[in-house]
Amino acid sequence: MSDTKSNAMWGGRFAAGPDAIMEAINASIGFDRRLARQDIDGSRAHAAMLAQQGILSSKDAEAIREGLLTVLSEIETGQFAFSAALEDIHMNVEARLKELIGEPAGRLHTGRSRNDQVATDFKLWVRDQLDAADAGLLALLRALLAQAEAGADWVMPGFTHLQTAQPVTWGHHMMAYVEMFARDRGRMQDARARMNECPLGAAALAGTSFPLDRDATAQALGFDRPAANSLDAVSDRDFALEFLAAASICAMHLSRMAEELVIWSSAQFRFVTLSDRFSTGSSIMPQKKNPDAAELIRAKIGRIVGANVALLTVMKGLPLAYSKDMQEDKEQVFDAADTLMLALAAMEGMVRDMTANRASLEDAAASGFSTATDLADWLVRELNLPFRDAHHVTGTLVAMAEAKGCDLPDLSLAEMQSVHGAIRADVFEVLGVHNSVASRTSYGGTAPSQVRAQVARWKERLG
């Protein structure tokens, strides 16, 4: 342990300085320096409010404002010397401000604690990330809509259990992802609206005796209102957890689509050709074109889900109000946000540049007994069979075709009638994949008319 008296800004109560190991475990400047702009924005708003309330002289407020702008410039240009001994971004900024303007720097913290300061900084940062995610999702949605519009009537197999189920259209499949990512965007927007309450002025946990105007600082920082309970304001990390939860669901959707692109771009499927710009090669096999962007999205998603679980685990046992455990909130969120933004950008680029191979899609749709359900529906509609009986007849015909090595449309009428004598020649009309998708005109169905209507609706909604 150090024998010298602590010179930390909180060191008045301590007779000795912290051990080097204590300094190492306590310091967060290695990562929370990312909050520099938000920290300085919050301090500028706080100083302006203190002056407005007569707590700080206008002269001191101006010196603080100018000094903070200088500090921000030094940080943004790489000239700022961060110190681990000063623990965090708040103390680093304040110490440098004191070097620049002297005694007025010590007045900035009036009516404020690092507890409400960091909660405000972190909220501002997460809010910025929600806005960035919204922009990334919007770009991805527009890329998906372009694919859907181009392939509204391109028939492809729809799958369950990764086995051919029913024919759908390329546009319909793309629109499924539009719906997913639009929900993700809605979750991000909901989280942003809910978190837009300002903790600044809550002080350590109980509020302050200084006559602060918390509405003024909230407005200056773009919040809707000040947080209503000072204890909750400094204890709350729901905003970070909501961001991580929304990011985790979005990440899961990105991973599902990445998985499909990996499969679809394989030589065994050939459904899509990925752009060279989002593929890599092999160091030994010259023929290889690997879907590495999609594979890396699929892999990186675990970091986002892991961050969500990690922060839940940090917060689950904490009494109110602040505990040092909460310092561990930021690295998880920083990494998750970085990963999400990169994954969104990579997916948008892949979707924008990829080419759907229409011939391969339609060839695959025409195999695998994809119109078996259409046959069963025809038996119900035209022959008035109960669906379970129609299901059995169709299954028998599928087994017959499978034994012959052909598909349902390749069976003769006589072969079909050997299973059910009332089957007529017009049954073959429903066995074509184009007729199948065209018939699915229910709202939200795969019929090209429905797909085009959904594309138009979403284009209008997104602007």
UniProtKB/Swiss-Prot annotation:
Known EC number: 4.3.2.1
Q: Which reaction does it catalyse?
A: 2-(N(omega)-L-arginino)succinate = fumarate + L-arginine
Alphabetic keyword roster: Amino-acid biosynthesis, Arginine biosynthesis, Cytoplasm, Lyase
| GO cellular component terms attached to this protein's record | cytosol
Q: In which pathway does it act?
A: Amino-acid biosynthesis; L-arginine biosynthesis; L-arginine from L-ornithine and carbamoyl phosphate: step 3/3
Q: Which GO terms describe its molecular function?
A: argininosuccinate lyase activity
Q: Name one GO biological process term.
A: L-arginine biosynthetic process
List the InterPro entries hit by this protein, alphabetically.
Answer: Arg_succ_lyase_C, Argininosuccinate_lyase, Fumarase/histidase_N, Fumarate_lyase_CS, Fumarate_lyase_fam, Fumarate_lyase_N, L-Aspartase-like
Location(s), subcellular: Cytoplasm
The residues forming the signal peptide are: none
Q: Which SUPFAM superfamilies match?
A: L-aspartase-like
Q: Which family does it belong to?
A: Belongs to the lyase 1 family. Argininosuccinate lyase subfamily.
* Protein name in the entry: Argininosuccinate lyase
Q: Which gene encodes it?
A: argH
